[in-house]
Each structure stands twice: as C-alpha cells, then as structure tokens.
C-alpha cells in the first residue's frame, strides 16, 4: 500500500480533473446542436421592430431602427454604398452609412480542415441573422448640430480601396459648419486606424464626445466551459482586466467598470475578436450590455468625455479597431507598437498565465524549428521532463527506498497486528532511521498539475493549434482524435454512438498509463486493486473527448515517465517489476483448495 501512495494521490487528483472536464465540456457539447438550432429559429422568427436603441444612464449612444434578420448577406451588402477592403489577411468592405465595419472575412482561416471550405466570416451586416459589426461616432448638442452616427452617410473623398498601402478618407459636413474628415488605414494583419479630424468653422466653441461600439446579434455556438472565456473583454484603465460573460448581462444590469483613462474593449470568441482602442488621452466610460428589444443583441461600447473645439480650430482623435484572429505574436506586437495596456490578455491564458504563455513561446519556437506542432508538443514534454527531473528523481528515489524497506514494514505489520497506533508510530520511526519521507513523491505530482493545465490551455485556446496537423489521421491537434474503434477505425460504414467513440491515440494513452501503473505491484487491498486495474480503462474513455494534442502529450509523458522510473530504480539498485507484474496479472491463478 505504501509503495502505491503516490499513484493513488495522482489518480484522485486526475479523476477530479476529468470529472470537471466531463461536467464543463462534454455535457455542454452534447447540447451544442440544440442551442444552435434554437438561436437560428429565434433569428428567423424575429421581425423588424422600430424604435431607438436604449441606453444606460450616462451612456446615451445614438441608435436607430433595429433591422430584421430577413436578408441574406449578399443582399444586405449590395444595397449600400461601400469602400472595398483588401489586405493579405482580410477582405470585405466598409459601409458608408455610419462608416460601419460590417463586412469582413479572414483570408487565412477556413471553417474546417478542408482547404475548399469557406473562409471565416467575422463581420456581417445588421440585417443578417449573424449581424456583427463595429462603428465609431459622436454625440453632440443642439449647438453642434448633427454629428456622425449610425445613419450618417459619409462621402468617399480620398482613395477608392482600403489596402495596407492605400488609406481612404471619408468626409461629412453638417448644417452648422463643422467638418469631419475620417482617414482609415489598415496594416497587413488585423489593425485599422481610424483618425478623425474635426474642424469647427462656426463662430462659437463646440463640445462633443466620441463613442465606439462592437455589436453582435447572436452568441457563438461553441460549448461554454470554464476554461475558456467568450464574451465581453477589455481593460478599463485602473480598473484592470474585464471579462464578462454573455449570461451576466442577460440576467443582470449592464456592467460598467467606471471612468477610465487608457484601455480597450470588445467582444472575444475562442479564436477571433473585435475590439476598439479609444483615444487614450481622454477619459471614457466602458459598458457591456444586452438589449432584448426587437432582436436580442450584445454590445460592448465606450463613451468619452467631451472635447471642446474652439472656433476656427480643429482637433484630431484616433481610434484603433482590431478585427481578426487572435494570433499570439500579432497581438503581442500590437500591445507594444500602439502602447495598448495588457492587450495580450485578449487571449485567455488562464490563471497560470506565468506558465501558460512561456510554454506557448517554447512550443512555438520548436514549431518554427521543425514545422509541426505535434513534434513541438513532444519536444516541449521532454524539456518539461528535464526541468522537473530533480523533483522526479527525488520522487522515484523515495519510491525505491520504500521498496527497500518493504520487508521491514511487513515485519512491523506482523508484530503489531491490530494495534494501528503502535504500527503507525513504528513506521514513522523506521522512516526516520532510513531517512525516508513518505510524502516526498506527492510534491512533484502536485507541482506538475499547473503545467498540465497550462499545456491544455495552450492547445485549446491558441489559434496556432487550430487545424494544426500531426501525422497520419490527426489533422487538427485542437480537436479530438477522429477515429473510433466502434467501426474498426473507419473500416466499417457506420459511426456508432458518440459516447463510445474511442480513437487510436486515447487507446495508446490508456496502454501507456496501464504500463506505468504496472511498474509497481498490485496493492493487496481488493478495492485498491480494482481501482488499480480499471483506472486506465476509465481514463481511456474519458480522454477520448480531449483535444488530440493533449492526449498525445499525455501518452508521450507516460512513456517518458516509464523510462525515467526504470532508469532511476536501476540506479538505486531496486528491481524493476514491470514484466513480473504483467506476468502475474495475466498468468492463471491457482484454484483455491476445497
């Protein structure tokens, strides 16, 4: 029993992990189609409802009629004047009504691993079922007259297509003599710069506030789990990082962190995001809200404090709009290049940020070296093993020493019989004399749990893992192994029930776990022996729904652990009992005497 103490600790902790996984991932995933169907039905049934969009106190943003979702994407795009967008990473257009970013596709990403599948659509017009857009406007007063808002028709006054080398200029002059010139530029990835020059040609000073919002009319259909944040996100100056789920604003009032100077706001999905970086020198209020009138929609917005433009003078305000894939090096570069506070938190690195991000950096380095993220996972596992080698050496050395004193422990058990207190005291004295810490092997297991979670986060949340192939049938390391033993791995023409799907890599992982546990003899207690025997089987089925990259890591880590334990035990002069244990397991047991 003492020899297997550390394994039972590991098993108990792992079971907790896997139960949580089943609760937070597998069950929600089974309802994914139902949720998607309900959302689609809701979008189809919604009819146009006139009326202005509501606003929370202190956040009175211009609104307008809420359009129905009765148009196709092509119909909605075709009915308005637009400026085309064409970059190496993006294609789409800007709607001249409201200068709205509501047509954007990501050239470098497709919906599935099939290279002929459609590219990812990020933004779509409000008139479509998947309406999702970003816009920037102003709030004035009677003195300012009409200012740019959702219904403003801008004039294209410079350029004809937005590319990294050709910005475009939009202009609008109101009835009071205030001129707005908007210059929009874009880089070769996902960042737009929106620079507004506001000139006051009236005889009196005017004050106006800028606003910006990211609005979407639906929620993503990916399973909602606690290891991943999808919803509202931003950094509100001194109030720090804000992560607000969709359900929070559905059930409660809008979330308003408070007045901020510096920061950003937006909406994030697992791999994609849309954010606005307001003018950093002017204080602003951020709000995350849900509106249920007409078509339900979710909105992340800001409103700045008013700026005053003197007669005959002009001011310049710059907003940044990020719309695209959350590529780690791109996001990190934007944080530095534009001095955006904590912009790297746009990617959900989790609680173990200090481990997760360096681990990604390591894996990304090996990927660039070898060109395969699967290979990068294997090499990263070796590096982690080397880092933890001193702890593992101590763990296995402690286990070896425990085996050495096993005969003495058996003698003590016979000597003390049912005197458990006396036996415990005698064993503690034996540990002291032999310089053995019976809990020494537990710490390496506990310390490595954050590493496991960090690796899981890297594989699950970073877009670099999306559709990243390994070898053979693994074409997406972020998805479960697509094979299943139910149909003999594709030889039979049926799929079988989803809960019985068991791929090749989960089976390999189960075998390695079985061998690792057999490095030690089966415990004498019948209950523990049953747990010892069946745990690899349970883990095999539970890990069938894990991302393939994580299962490959676990199988490889088990293999390295078997080799490591064998080498250390040989160095300690302790017999490696793997083959003897396997032989005793599969050999015929003698029949009990009658």
Swiss-Prot record:
It is found in: Cell inner membrane. One of its GO terms (molecular function) is membrane insertase activity. Required for the insertion and/or proper folding and/or complex formation of integral membrane proteins into the membrane. Involved in integration of membrane proteins that insert both dependently and independently of the Sec translocase complex, as well as at least some lipoproteins. Aids folding of multispanning membrane proteins. GO terms for cellular component: plasma membrane. It is a multi-pass membrane protein. InterPro entries: Membr_insert_YidC (IPR019998), Membr_insert_YidC_N (IPR028053), YidC/ALB3/OXA1/COX18 (IPR001708), YidC/Oxa/ALB_C (IPR028055), YidC_ALB_C (IPR047196), YidC_periplasmic_sf (IPR038221). This is Membrane protein insertase YidC. Interacts with the Sec translocase complex via SecD. Specifically interacts with transmembrane segments of nascent integral membrane proteins during membrane integration. It comes from Rhizobium meliloti (strain 1021) (Ensifer meliloti). Its main location: membrane. The chain crosses the membrane at residues 7-27, 369-389, 443-463, 488-508, 532-552. GO terms for biological process: protein insertion into membrane; protein transport. HAMAP family: YidC_type1. Residues 36-73 are annotated as: Disordered.
């Amino acid at each position: 029993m003492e020899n297997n103490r550390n394994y039972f600790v590991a098993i108990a902790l792992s079971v907790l992990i896997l139960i949580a996984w089943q609760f937070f991932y597998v069950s929600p995933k089974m309802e994914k189609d139902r949720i998607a169907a309900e959302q689609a039905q809701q979008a189809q049934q919604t009819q146009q409802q006139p009326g202005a969009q509501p606003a929370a106190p202190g956040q009175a943003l211009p609104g307008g009629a809420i359009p129905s979702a009765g148009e196709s994407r092509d119909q909605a795009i075709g009915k308005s004047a637009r400026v085309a967008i064409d970059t190496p990473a993006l294609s789409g257009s800007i709607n001249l009504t409201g200068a709205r970013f509501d047509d954007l596709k990501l050239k470098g990403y497709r919906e599935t691993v099939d290279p002929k599948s459609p590219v990812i659509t990020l933004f779509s017009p409000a008139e479509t079922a998947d309406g999702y857009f970003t816009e920037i406007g102003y709030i004035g007063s009677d003195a300012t007259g009409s200012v740019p808002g959702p219904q403003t028709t801008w004039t294209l006054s410079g350029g004809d297509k937005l590319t990294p080398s050709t910005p475009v200029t939009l202009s609008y002059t109101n009835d009071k003599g205030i001129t707005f010139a908007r210059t929009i530029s874009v880089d070769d990835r996902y960042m737009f710069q929106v620079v507004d020059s506001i000139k006051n040609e009236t005889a009196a000073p005017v004050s106006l506030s800028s606003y910006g919002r990211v609005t979407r009319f639906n929620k993503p259909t990916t399973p909602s789990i606690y290891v991943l944040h999808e919803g509202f996100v931003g950094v509100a100056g001194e109030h720090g990082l804000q992560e607000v789920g969709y359900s929070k604003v559905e059930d409660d009032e809008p979330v308003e962190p408070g007045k901020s100077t510096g920061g950003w706001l937006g909406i994030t999905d697992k791999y994609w995001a849309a954010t606005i970086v307001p003018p950093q020198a002017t204080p602003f209020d951020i709000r995350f809200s849900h509106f249920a009138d007409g078509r339900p929609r979710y909105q992340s917005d800001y409103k700045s404090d008013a700026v005053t433009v003197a007669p005959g003078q002009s001011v310049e305000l710059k907003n940044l709009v990020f719309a695209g894939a959350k590529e780690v090096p791109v996001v990190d570069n934007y944080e530095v290049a534009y001095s955006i506070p904590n912009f790297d938190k746009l990617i959900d690195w989790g609680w173990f940020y200090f481990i997760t991000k360096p681990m990604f950096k390591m894996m990304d380095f090996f990927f660039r070296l070898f060109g395969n993220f699967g290979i990068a996972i294997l090499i990263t596992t070796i590096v982690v093993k080397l880092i933890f080698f001193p702890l593992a050496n101590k763990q296995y050395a402690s286990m070896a020493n425990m085996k050495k004193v096993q005969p003495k422990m058996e003698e003590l058990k016979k000597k003390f019989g049912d005197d458990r207190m006396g036996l415990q005291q005698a064993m503690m004295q034996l540990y002291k004399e032999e310089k053995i810490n019976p809990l020494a092997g537990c710490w390496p297991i506990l310390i490595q749990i954050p590493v496991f979670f960090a690796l899981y986060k890297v594989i699950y949340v970073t877009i670099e893992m999306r559709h990243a192939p390994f070898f053979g049938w693994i074409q997406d390391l972020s998805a479960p192994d697509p094979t299943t033993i139910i149909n003999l791995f594709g030889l039979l023409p049926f799929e079988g029930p989803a809960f019985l799907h068991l791929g090749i890599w989960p089976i390999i992982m189960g075998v390695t776990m079985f061998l690792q546990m057999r490095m030690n003899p089966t415990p004498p207690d019948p209950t523990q022996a049953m747990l010892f025997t069946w745990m690899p089987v349970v883990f095999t089925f539970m890990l069938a729904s894990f991302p393939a990259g994580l299962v490959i890591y676990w199988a490889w880590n088990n293999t390295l652990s078997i080799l490591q334990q064998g080498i250390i035990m040989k160095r300690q002069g302790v017999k490696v009992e793997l083959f003897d244990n396997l032989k005793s397991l599969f050999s015929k047991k003698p029949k009990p005497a009658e």
